[in-house]
A protein has these predicted regions:
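Terminal targeting signals and extreme-terminal segments of soluble enzymes
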Residues: 1-129
Length: 129
């Protein structure tokens, strides 16, 4: 890769739903080449996007559609090509207009990779699919 080009990052191509319960969603994914940053580690934006997506799914699991209102993330350990990540999202506040979701990302060695908190703004009751 040359220094003057951005590396394309992909997030949603290879994840598996482990659990989808009211207020709690778990997915796994493998870090692939398109998940890496310029230095060969999982891109922070990739990790953040996984957490954001899970927060949306947790909101849906409570019966409501929601969008991200505020978020924060702490990156604790780098991930590399081939690592298996488990993304665990839990609703810690199930309010009428907002939901707060805590997300933990761990690797295959059960080491914490990132911890995030998302405040989700409720946009309406989920319509049955």
């Amino acid at each position: 890769m040359s220094d003057n080009h951005l590396h394309e990052i992909r997030v949603f191509e290879n994840f598996d739903m482990v659990s989808f319960e009211k207020g709690h969603v778990i997915v796994t994914t493998e870090v692939v080449d398109k998940s890496l940053n310029y230095y060969g580690f999982a891109h922070g934006g990739y990790i953040f996007t996984l957490c954001d997506q899970i927060s949306g799914l947790v909101s849906i699991s409570t019966g409501f559609d929601a969008v991200t209102l505020q978020s924060s993330i702490n990156y604790l350990k780098s991930s590399k090509l081939g690592d298996t990540l488990l993304i665990d999202g839990r609703c810690v506040h199930d309010g009428r207009t907002t939901k707060v979701v805590d997300v933990t990302v761990t690797n295959q060695l059960k080491q914490e990779v990132a911890k995030a908190t998302f405040t989700m703004f409720v946009t309406g009751k989920r319509k049955d699919d």
